[in-house]
Amino acid sequence: PAAEAQQLANRGTSSGVAPVAPGAVDPLLGVRSPLPKDWIGLRQLAPNIPILVMAGHADSQGISGSGTSGAAVAAGAAPMYPGITDEHYWNLVIAHAVATLGQQRGLNIRFYKPPLRTIVDGDAPGTNWSMGRDHTAAGGYALEIHFDAWGPSGVGSGLIPPLHTAFSTIDEQLAREFGAYP
């Protein structure tokens, strides 16, 4: 699987379709981030690198930073699931699906869900931040899924590059598929 991913990273998108240009609208994911990408992912990773997938805002429900409500809720509809933002709902659904499909395709990938929906201290054990930090420090690759590119305050879809490691070929491929942030 990693060799296949590397081949895809070298030739373009996994779908064989040209990537959506920055600022353009993808029919599935919406607008791509128009921000200029100022990095290149060149670091090669082990073919069996452990990948941790997390749902954005999974540990911040009911407090500042809980994710966007979404267009339907802003227009008066009820949230998709009581007690969580619509963004968090989709983050959970997609992060779990990514891990499940990745496992079916032979990737060393797992989904992480915090023990609580509200953890005020972002550095506390069990938060996405602390789990992702520890996972990458141990040599793994961590990815947090977000769907907050909605409305006038949204920037658009894209990969926010890692803060603590050199940019990798996985980062580069994800940026080609979904857009990139500087």
Language-model segments: residues:
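Generic non-transmembrane alpha-helical segments
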Residues: 97, 101, 173-182
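A short, glycine/acidic-enriched catalytic loop
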Residues: 67-82, 148-178
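Conserved acidic residues
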Residues: 139-140
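Solvent-exposed loop/turn segments at secondary-structure junctions
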Residues: 57-60, 115-119, 147-153, 165-166, ...
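N-terminal secretory targeting signals
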Residues: 1-47
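Active-site histidine-acidic residue metal-binding/catalytic motifs
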Residues: 32-131
